[in-house]
């Protein structure tokens, strides 16, 4: 039995299927359409678990922005979780600068946690991210941490965040994604996938089903693409929130996992 099939079987037998949470990179400025997108997030928050990533200027920005504060406060009041974007330069950015931006997010926007971007998965940088983890967890009461390497990491990275983003790429690359075996034994809430350039609602549902099969508890799927695929909400947003919030019937879920395993087995048997 190949590695992916084994992982799928383990994940199905070991984990309860539940509603997914949406992790939304809300990289739209709150004017014109941007205000509408933020209001759409707030409107959905009572019905589906949403974590929105606040990103005024590749970080909190040099000065407080009242437009961002207004939409952020409304989103939180509706029940959404708000986390602030900070880039780490793959472990090369000064810890002092990163910590200063973390401080500004809490002081200016009252965030519920931090989104660490450009996260290295190299062993020599583990201590860097453990230090940031300790700083956030020790310094703030609301201290949810999402770390985004955008790819696989060693298991030790679980100590750096509450959620690891282990995939951030276009849909064309998702079909070939195979999770590391160690992830199967973890709770699905520890992992997130961000998938863009997903053409329509049917393709979105397939992506979400696949994320479930990979033991992923947080997901975001969009038809946006280009240099910044996170500057709009998907045209199928309503369908996505409904599908993420729904809990699949056990029989249907078992059938999907079995079908995924069969497909992988057939692909692996093709002559090269």
Where do the model's predicted regions map?
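Positively charged n-region of N-terminal signal peptides that target proteins for export
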Residues: 1-4, 249, 268-272
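Small-residue packing motifs within transmembrane alpha-helices
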Residues: 3, 10, 254-257
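Residue-level detector of intrinsically disordered, flexible termini
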Residues: 5-7, 18, 251
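Hydrophobic aliphatic residue packing
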Residues: 9, 247-248
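N-terminal signal peptide c-region/cleavage motif recognized by signal peptidases
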Residues: 13-16
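Glycan-processing catalytic domains of CAZymes
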Residues: 18-246
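Hydrophobic alpha-helical membrane-insertion segments
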Residues: 126, 171, 258-260, 268
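A short, hydrophobic C-terminal helix/tail in secreted or cell-surface proteins
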Residues: 248-266
């Amino acid at each position: 039995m190949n590695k992916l099939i084994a992982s799928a079987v383990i994940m199905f037998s070991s984990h309860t299927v539940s509603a997914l949470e949406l992790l939304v990179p809300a990289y739209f400025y709150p004017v014109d359409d941007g205000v509408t997108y933020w209001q759409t997030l707030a409107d959905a928050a009572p019905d589906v678990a949403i974590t929105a990533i606040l990103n005024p200027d590749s970080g909190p920005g040099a000065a407080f922005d009242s437009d961002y504060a207004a939409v952020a406060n409304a989103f939180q009041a509706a029940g959404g979780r708000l986390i602030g974007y900070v880039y780490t330069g793959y472990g090369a950015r000064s810890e002092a600068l990163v910590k200063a931006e973390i401080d500004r997010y809490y002081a200016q926007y009252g965030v519920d946690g931090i989104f660490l971007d450009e996260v290295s998965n190299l062993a020599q940088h583990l201590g860097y991210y453990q230090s940031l983890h300790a700083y956030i967890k020790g310094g703030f009461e609301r201290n949810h941490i999402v770390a985004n390497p955008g790819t696989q990491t060693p298991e030790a990275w679980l100590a750096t965040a509450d959620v690891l983003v282990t995939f951030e790429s276009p849909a064309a690359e998702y079909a070939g994604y195979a999770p590391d075996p160690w992830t199967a034994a973890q709770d699905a809430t520890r992992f997130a996938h961000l998938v863009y350039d997903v053409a329509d609602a049917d393709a979105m549902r397939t992506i979400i089903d696949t994320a479930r099969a990979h033991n992923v508890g947080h997901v975001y799927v969009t038809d946006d693409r280009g240099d910044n695929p996170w500057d709009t909400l998907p045209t199928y947003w309503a369908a996505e929130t409904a599908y993420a919030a729904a809990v699949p019937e056990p029989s249907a879920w078992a059938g999907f996992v079995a079908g995924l395993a069969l497909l992988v087995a057939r692909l692996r048997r093709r002559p090269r």
